[in-house]
């Protein structure tokens, strides 16, 4: 949903920053924060467990912030929101989508980009460093170790 709200279903963050203790090589554990930054400066900040200031914005962008319960510090945000057209209705009945060949609201495109957010964060946590990501090439920039974690070899006898 965050990608949709931000109008970013067709892209991914260009930078992932982590603040976390060193992770076990085979599993990701706890973190203090993960910050995803998009090309336009918009950020998504995830706080882990009991860390973080409860007053930190959920979404922070160049024009303001959105906090818990959709509290905003964006000037005249309610008027700005009312100026936007209603979004196109989305079909949420999967069976109906199969029958009519309409795209499902939660489709492969936005599902892929949502999974990419999770995966890039997991890679940054495992390596415990800031990573830069190319959302078009779908690879980390100048970081072979990070790219190897995006496409890990499967255990035998499995393959694709």
Predicted segments — roles?
Residues 1-41:
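Rossmann-like dinucleotide-binding domain that binds NAD(P)(H)
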Residues 39-43, 63-64:
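Glycine-centered tight beta-turn/hairpin loop motif at sheet-sheet or coil-to-beta transitions
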Residues 22-26, 49-50, 83-86:
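Short Gly/Pro-enriched turn/cap motifs at secondary-structure boundaries
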């Amino acid at each position: 949903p965050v990608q949709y709200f931000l109008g970013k279903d067709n892209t991914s963050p260009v930078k992932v920053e982590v603040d976390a203790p060193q992770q076990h090589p085979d599993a990701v554990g706890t973190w203090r924060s993960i910050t995803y930054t998009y090309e336009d400066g918009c950020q998504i900040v995830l706080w882990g467990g009991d860390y973080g200031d409860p007053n930190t914005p959920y979404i922070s962008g160049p024009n303001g912030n959105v906090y818990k319960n959709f509290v905003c510090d964006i000037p005249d945000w309610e008027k700005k929101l009312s100026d936007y057209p209603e979004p196109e209705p989305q079909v949420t009945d999967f069976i109906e989508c199969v029958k009519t060949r309409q795209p499902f609201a939660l489709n492969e495109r936005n599902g892929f980009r949502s999974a990419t957010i999770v995966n890039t964060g997991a890679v940054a946590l495992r390596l415990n460093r800031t990573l830069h990501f190319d959302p078009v090439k779908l690879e980390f920039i100048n970081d072979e170790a990070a790219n190897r974690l995006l496409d890990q070899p499967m255990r035998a006898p499995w393959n694709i």
